């Protein structure tokens, strides 16, 4: 199975380093655009700003407390697939283009009130692979985000913000909760969020309903798919920290390896990152899940660990090794031991072909990243996939079953290699080209 990817991304944003020499700084690009703070442009003479910066901070009052920031994000991606789904049942080869446009307005009305709005148009050309144009591919003219913030000052260094409306979530390294920037249509939720910011802690507490894509109309929240929780980040030092989280998911009519019913699942997790030395970084994350699916109780867990080594004498070159494990069921029906990956950005951790997700999986991987010029970066990654438990299924990046569990089959899934080249055309435009190949062990093939 082979996948060729090429994409061009354009964003109205400015790299921080380009403006620091002028005596002011602008924020680095964040896919969650509402996290960008452009208030640093307050008081800067507009004649000193770059043309694209002038729409990022427009004063609406003489004192500068009322202002608006406009921005956007355009992406076009070409995909070429060969032997998709290993040549069965049909339409194994195809090429198509995906398009996505995002435009936002960030209104600041005084120091406490804020309104953030973002519209989206996601479309796809003729996709003849199984599933055709899927909900993750197509969502035409939709309100992606529309929320109101009200911020209280607790003291000179701490604030408490209440957010109500349609919003994107992205916590930690996006292993469990992500707006899914790789997918064309993205994710979003309707809900309420509280955000506590102190010099040492950032705490999000939230209650929401997921918004599935309605390809025939506007998206509406699904009261049968709810997400709530608390996500706290503690700063330990400049290069280290700890995250603690509790995530509550409630869904109707789900099935895990033969156990069906309504799901009520709690995820308790912790993530820690830091440095061993000037050249060696590390990260670990673990989570345990409890609850019930129908009449079956839930007991599942995940763990990931990664070390990153900065290669001496090489320009921004890094070599990394990682282990990802997520539990599976040891027998069908009854107690559920399959980890639920929730709303992940699995594409970033289990290969770009998206055959594998964070459920019933062991992935041993290595990656090498290097900068070959000021504008060009190359990354190569190798994944070795195994099912954690032979009696459970192989699940893809979306949580769908690729192959049902079979205790008599080998746990060996196969190997994937991903090669990516990215080129920065300008501060606002980046292009990338990727090639991914996967070799699947014969017993794992779904057909």
Show the residue positions of the predicted features.
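N-terminal periplasmic/intermembrane-space "pro-region" immediately following the signal or transit peptide
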Residues: 5-93, 315-322
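Extracellular/periplasmic loop regions
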Residues: 23-41, 45-49, 258, 285, ...
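Extracytoplasmic loops and strand-loop junctions of Gram-negative outer membrane beta-barrel proteins
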Residues: 52-56, 84-89, 129-132, 174-177, ...
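Outer-membrane beta-barrel architecture
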Residues: 56-60, 102-104, 147-149, 193-195, ...
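Surface-exposed loop and membrane-interface regions of Gram-negative outer-membrane beta-barrel proteins
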Residues: 80-99, 107-158, 175-178, 255-257, ...
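Signature for the C-terminal beta-barrel architecture of outer-membrane proteins
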Residues: 154-162, 175-332, 391, 404-419, ...
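Conserved C-terminal beta-signal and adjacent last beta-strands/turns
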Residues: 366, 380, 414-425, 429-436
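Single conserved hydrophobic/aromatic residue that forms the stacking wall/gate
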Residues: 438-447
